[in-house]
Structures are given as structure tokens and as C-alpha cells.
Amino acid sequence: MYAEAERLKDNGQDVEAIELLVKLLEIDPQHVLSHLTLARLYTRTGQHDLAIAHNQKACELEPNDSFNFTAMSVTYQRAFAGTGERKYIQLAEDAMAHARSMGN
């Protein structure tokens, strides 16, 4: 199911990929890759609040994975670019600092 969602994403079928990933998370709400992929897709479609929520969930599920916090920083940066809301600048910096402090 996840592989199919990735294929849809790669083919630019964002809506279909989102629908499939949401279904996957209904089955397995702890599937971190689905949360990270939804964060990317929601960012691409300008749904920054949803992107942030899914990236935060990935960080909660795998709090020792620095990649998740690096991705969180990027999600915040793109939220700032898409909305102009300055609060996202500090949040992006904080997430990146956290990722760097983990050293893995």
C-alpha cells in the first residue's frame, strides 16, 4: 500500500497519494513513513497545518531519529515560504538544532 502511494506521489498524483496514505494510517497509525510522506504532500498542496501535524507525529513516534527533526525543519521552512508567518522561522531553527544535537 505504501509503495503504491509513493508511486502516485512520484507521478504527481498528490490527491490520490494522500487518500491512500490516510487509509494506510487508519490501519497502522504508527507508520512513520506515511506520516513523513503526508507531510511532504500536504506541503506541496499548500496545506501547511496538516504537513506540520504529520511531521510532528513522525517526531513523536521516532524521537531518536534526527532525520525526522531535519524533515520537521524543512516543513517549517516551507510553511514560512507558503504563508509568510514568521513564527515558522524560529520553529525551523529549533527543529534543526534538535536534529544536530542528536548527532546520528
What spans do the regions from the language model cover?
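Alpha-helical segment of the N-proximal tetratricopeptide repeat
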Residues: 1-23, 27
